[in-house]
Amino acid sequence: MAEDIETKVVKAKKASIELSSVSEEVKNRALEAMAESLDRERKAILEANSKDLEYASELKKVGKLTQALVDRLKVTDSKIDGMIAGIMDVIKLKDPVGETLSTLELDNDLILYQISCPIGLIGVIFESRPDVVPQVMSLCLKSGNATIFKGGSEARESNRTIFEILVKAIESTEGMPKGAFQLMETREEIMSLLSLDAYVDLLIPRGSNEFVKFIQDNTKIPVLGHTSGICHIYVDEFADPDTAWKVCFDAKVQYPAVCNAIETLLVNRKIAEAFLPKMAEMYIKAGVELRCDKDSYILLAEKGLSPLSKATEEDWSLEYNDLILSIKLVDTIKEAIAHINTFGSHHTDGIITENASRRKEFIGLVDSSSVMVNASTRFADGYRYGKGAEVGISTNKIHSRGPVGMEGLLIYKYILMGKGQVVADYAGENAKPYTHRKLDLKFADVN
């Protein structure tokens, strides 16, 4: 088994070299073929997904799968439309490979170029969501990266069907290398993949807190991702109530099973009585379980609102991924910021305010990869950020942070163009000086 896995990885690694230099025209043709194949093979995809949903239903009954994961697993015609739209958006994006990032003259006829290039071979390990396959494959293809996919067993039929449809489309496109995209399906294969740091350049895990943490703790391969999505909205005393009601409702209810839905609502005490009862009523009508701190519980109970639960200290650190929301009253914006930076996951947090200085303070001090002002946290998404699609959301403080699109799948190399220069001429008593002059030159224009 392990030898078979290594064979797949070595094959993908070799193909990654060829893929890195495929032209934009060929890559776009392959992407078009992917989109057309998804549209043509809808029936096969939905049939495979129905098998997974039956299996997932059994897992849920015995407590091995949450409703949130079941929701993410479901594929519909509209979700297939979304997969296709995401691929078409990637086609519209400019080829990011070979872009000149900077040009520096070291001396006459000694020019240093910094250009973008693919990372190489990326491993993507994910739970439940079959739409990850076309999202990530399209971005990796356009950015010239070979990819190993490993999905959860609960989505095995969907993942395999979608993967095979897409790979057939890619490999039937003239000029595309074969073997650049591989699929792994067993838990044992994950452990083998995690040990192949000699071949795999980056891992992108997508799933629960425990899942991502497990990946991080069991590999030497660099990992890009986030362990949880504990997101907040702070309703400031200078908030417009209508804006706050609308935004806070969307941020929890529109799709609670995802990592950019809020888990805690922080409300300034000065606006609480005017804002919170109506907000709570909206949530309760939508089926949201409210877990309130002492003061918000008293306020809402006195208004006759129910059902209400009392929040525990543990609730501030929980990612529910469900119709559950913690509520806390705060005295100041500083208290709200301190709470977010203490209990949040540095994913996405927002403020509702009409006060410019409060807005500036929140943006400057909240340590999150995305900060929303008078807008729903649900906008924190690669597609909505105009990236075509996303490979994931990173809370790491590395080269990629927030929703990661193609730019997060690129690194750079330096190319020095000279005419016989040697370091000896720039060292010693009669050393020539470096000019270190920035130039507006593109490497693509070099003859």
From Swiss-Prot:
BP GO terms, sorted: L-proline biosynthetic process
Recorded catalytic activity of this chain's protein: L-glutamate 5-semialdehyde + phosphate + NADP(+) = L-glutamyl 5-phosphate + NADPH + H(+)
Molecular function as annotated in GO: glutamate-5-semialdehyde dehydrogenase activity; NADP binding
Keywords associated with the record: Amino-acid biosynthesis, Cytoplasm, NADP, Oxidoreductase, Proline biosynthesis
Enzyme class: oxidoreductase
InterPro entries: Ald_DH/histidinol_DH, Ald_DH_C, Ald_DH_N, Aldehyde_DH_dom, G-glutamylP_reductase_CS, Glu-5-SA_DH, GPR_dom
This protein's pathway: Amino-acid biosynthesis; L-proline biosynthesis; L-glutamate 5-semialdehyde from L-glutamate: step 2/2
E.C. designation(s): 1.2.1.41
GO cellular component, one term: cytoplasm
The keyword NADP is assigned to this record: yes
UniProt xrefs under PROSITE patterns: PROA
Subcellular localization(s) per the UniProt record: Cytoplasm
Highest taxon listed in the record's lineage: Archaea
PANTHER family, A to Z: DELTA-1-PYRROLINE-5-CARBOXYLATE SYNTHASE (PTHR11063:SF8), GLUTAMATE SEMIALDEHYDE DEHYDROGENASE (PTHR11063)
Stated family: Belongs to the gamma-glutamyl phosphate reductase family.
Functional summary from the UniProt entry: Catalyzes the NADPH-dependent reduction of L-glutamate 5-phosphate into L-glutamate 5-semialdehyde and phosphate. The product spontaneously undergoes cyclization to form 1-pyrroline-5-carboxylate.
Name recorded for this polypeptide: Gamma-glutamyl phosphate reductase
Natural source organism: Methanosarcina acetivorans (strain ATCC 35395 / DSM 2834 / JCM 12185 / C2A)
